[in-house]
Amino acid sequence: MVNAVDFNGRPFHFIGVGGIGMSALAYILAQKGFRVSGSDVRPNHITHKLESIGVSFFGKQEPANLEFFNRDSVSALTSGDKDITPQVVCSTAINASNSEYKAALKNGCPIFHRSDILAALISQYNSIAVAGTHGKTTTSSMIGYMLLQAGVDPTIIVGGEVKAWEGNARLGQSPYLVAEADESDGSLVKHSPEIGIITNIELDHPDHYDTLDQVVDIFKTFTSQCKTLVACIDCETVRDRFQPDISYSLSPDSGADYYVTNIDYRADGTAALVWEKGIALGVLNLCVLGHHNLSNALAAVAIGRQLGLEFGEIARGLATFEGARRRFEFRGEVDGITFIDDYAHHPSELSATLAAARLQARPGQRVVAIFQPHRYSRTHTFVNEFAPSFSHAD
């Protein structure tokens, strides 16, 4: 990117601001006091929230939106420039045919991918960036929640909505930032956090990657830019191809720095004894289900300890973490049928989600899966893996 993000007062305009990743950035910038506008052809509860904190929202995407800060009398009075040209932010979903995007190019607006804004924010904080094919949202939310409960007051940017901060982002006052770092379009390579986390690595996003090696290369670049790497060595690819500074695993025989024993998977949560380099720290109780969430929590334990928290503080925080929206989210119960909503769309995610559902099911109760495939390219690439991923369902 030729241009550098200007944090000296120049306004921001987001094309497609209603998306989960874009809206989080718009929210943080607005809360920091920057002038922010955004457009989206599908207004939703997220855009309504942005409007409530002062973001100027447009329900149509058209070139005139880029002139808002010139038309706005307050902006004109507070700017020393005659032409208040915004910095334009796009996601991968916005292509060259978009009318606002074309107008931004024509008018010479600085144009940034959303990952450029996130990377710029990451560089301003003691940042913890959570990467991985699966578990990014839950792990980053867990870490943010744990730090919040411990009084650290972090800034948080995640790819899901969390009840504790009523959305997908919160602005804290401490020097810490917890961010979800996305690999789907290769933009992971832009981030240089103090601490990087890898939850796992698999081939996904076949519209962007052809082979696992291509995915690994992206993660290799990312890890080379992390001052400290924390990674789960239960993943074979991570174990064989990366050298984390701090490792974690669900197996006591893995040689990991952090591991668990005495695991108790229950219908109402999970408990395990946590170990740190051969020393028992104590029992961790979670109200979220499944081995995948225990692994996510172990990443949070490793981060908490790295930041100097006592295990008791960590355990108390994680014990009340209820998860993010659409991550094994309880939606209600009718006639004895419990409805769970989950974003899982990769075979590995489906298997983990249904295994957690099986743990929660009462004796004699069936587990019925209703699945909506996400993207033709993913369904076509993993067609042989999808069938066995439903083995925990009836």
Report the location of each language-model feature:
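Conserved motor-coupling elements within RecA-like helicase/translocase cores
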Residues: 170-175
